[in-house]
Amino acid sequence: MDKNLKKEIENRRTFAIISHPDAGKTTLTEKFLLYGGAINTAGSVKGKANSKYAVSDWMGIEKERGISVTSSALQFNYEGYCINILDTPGHQDFSEDTYRTLMAADSAVMVIDASKGVEAQTIKLFKVCVMRHIPIFTFINKMDLEARDPYELLEEIENVLGIKTCPINWPIGSGKRFKGVYDRDTKKISMFQAVSVGGAKSAAETTYDLEDEAFKGEVGDELYDQLMDDVELLDGASEPFDQDLVDKGELSPVFFGSALTTFGIETFLEHFLKMTESPLPRMSDIGLIDPITEPFSGFVFKIQANMNKAHHDRIAFMRVCSGKFDATKDVFHVQSGKKMKLSRPQQIMAQDRKVIDEAYAGDVIGVFDPGIFSIGDTICTPGKKFTYEGIPTFAPEHFCRLVALDSMKRKQFMKGVTQIAQEGAIQIFQDYNLEMSEIIVGVVGTLQFDVLKYRMENEYSCDVRLEPLPYGHIRWVKDPATDLNSIKCPSDTKRVKDMKGNPLILFTNEWSIRLLLERNEGIELTEFKKN
């Protein structure tokens, strides 16, 4: 076995960061990059014309609004590890792209605002992590601002998300009285010191032992006594740390800190790297594929067109699952049955692209896509032929009719909407019985409608109108051979088909779904489509 290959793969960690809007996910991502030396200063991310943009935000609409619409892949080195972060959108409306990004991660970091606790978007993303049984780490952020009781926050995580928690460190006070954290592993106290917002790494932290008189003098009797009670209670009553349960995604290690002031980031990184594993074997149609002993293979989890308007290019993001990718060698695209060289392989950080010659299991690379790749495609070494488990298509929740304002631009219109749909940010449907019918667009989050309109007008020079539709649910009919015309549908439903001709039904509410199931014995409907 190639010892260098083994070492490279064992040093890799690939994780996604999930959170609700404004919980501090982008700030945390940037502070990680600061520690790895990937960037020099962190810009606080707001939608102001004169502010710095986050390193992971690149699309025009993202710059205008100061939000992350797409999911970016960022790589940095830290303490001998090569870390790949999959950054997911954190604004109110996210896309199916966000769910798919989690299919490429080996673990997830869940960022929670200490004043708000578990919020709606966190719950949606958490469900995908649970579906995949990946480890989930919790970073409770903004402890230097007004925060809820830490016990209350842990209880909410356990009750709402159904996962056990194990605090690795514990806060001493919060808001203006936030003094630092107690590390339950090392039994040391790190005193809170704020670093300026755009500053580099945190200032040298003052550390104390629990019994130090100097520490007691600095925090005062009330906070000291509270901490002593907390330590006793945690040691006696909290869930003990169990690496096996962490690996199965049943126990979440919890950390407290403040990303904006760079407090608690280094501690979190060090514990996280010890508690996570290098890339694990992945399931395919021929069984598990070992990341170290098997030659190169990977799968496409995201496609993005026009990442650089000057290039009019289309990039396929690929997660390398096994072996070493060598840019000089041919690869085999399983779905088309073709041998090819991957053109211009690169690592992408916002607008910066670095052309690479090689990549290892765990890495995420972008490759030029001439229009042959689809989400979920498998790419492997010639001579091998298998497919990784498909990435599910998730049911959209919002629907619009898309109309081209200039009927002479029908060709441009269809090209634009089809390309954007192939990237997976939107899904398109047509009437089940009519061939050249209206285009119905379905999205997971409504901001994708704005993104679609913006991109159709700016990238495809095609003015469009979006007409909202009353539907709030869509279901695939499990048997694709079903004739929808034979199904007794309630009057407020609509029969449609997707790009692949699969039959679906649009519903206005859940009552209509129940009514259809009652009227049609034996029919099976599903919320997501396995690909």
Regions found by a protein language model. Give the residues of each.
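Structural and coupling elements of P-loop NTPases
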Residues: M1-N531
